[in-house]
Amino acid sequence: MILITSAKYSSSDFTLEFGKIPPSFLPLGNKRLYEYQIELFKNFNQKFFLSLPSDFKLSKFDEKKLKELNVEILFVPNNLSLGESVVYCLNVCCAFDEKLYILHGDTFFKELAFKENSLQVAKVKENYDWAYLDNEFHTPLKTIEDDLILAGAYSFSHPQFLIKCIVESNYSFVDGMKSYSKVYAFDIIKNDTWLDFGLITSYFHSKKSVSTQRSFNNIDISNGYIKKSSSWQEKIKAEINWFDNLPKELFIYTPKVITYEDSYEIEYLCNNTLAELYVFGKLPSYVWKRIFK
């Protein structure tokens, strides 16, 4: 079985931006993050489960989309730790003779491959209280590289034994995995395609890696700018003309723009669009009143 663990709401920084939503429901490239996460497992012939907070209300659109994707929702009691949440989900739905894959809801990879028992790891990118790969994990490696963190994707050949290990480790998910590895050692897979959506700063950085361009547009993001060109030259020239003729009084509301004959570069701002906030967020009405003032 495949389990995406998204049973805890995103942090307060995300609540300020989008309202109260679980990490798998964050907007990414005109979709929700869960659509990209599920796509990673398209060639796995396994049942798919997504855990959510018990009081989270699914929209009709998300209900329909998740049904189309053959994903079963597991509503988990609020305020459980990660280890408690995983044990709850596995006790509800796991077939213990099947292999188990776990992907954290605030995690995405451009590429993902597993071994029988494996941990995806990545080099640390931000100053945060990460779960590090240390010598308490039993692996075939003789030495463990410094500054490697658990990147949020795991495979287990014996899920029932994993439950036992987590429970005996006072429901600590990480300590439970360390105990599990004493019997079933983990292969370590260093994955440089990891994108983190657990911190608001890394969220905006990760968003840049997923393009929203249409087929006739070319978009490149680098050095703080988005360069846009297109095979539809009339459209690009019309956009350049719009920027060139913008009244100076409005410059404080627009990003910096560098225009060329057949393309332009626009400053990349770490802001969400109104479309993302409206379609994917759960903002209260008073926030929208303030926006439109």
Q: Where in the sequence are the language-model features?
A:
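A cross-family kinase active-site recognition segment
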Residues: 285-293
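Short, charged/polar "capping" segments at the starts of alpha-helices
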Residues: 12, 54-61, 234-237
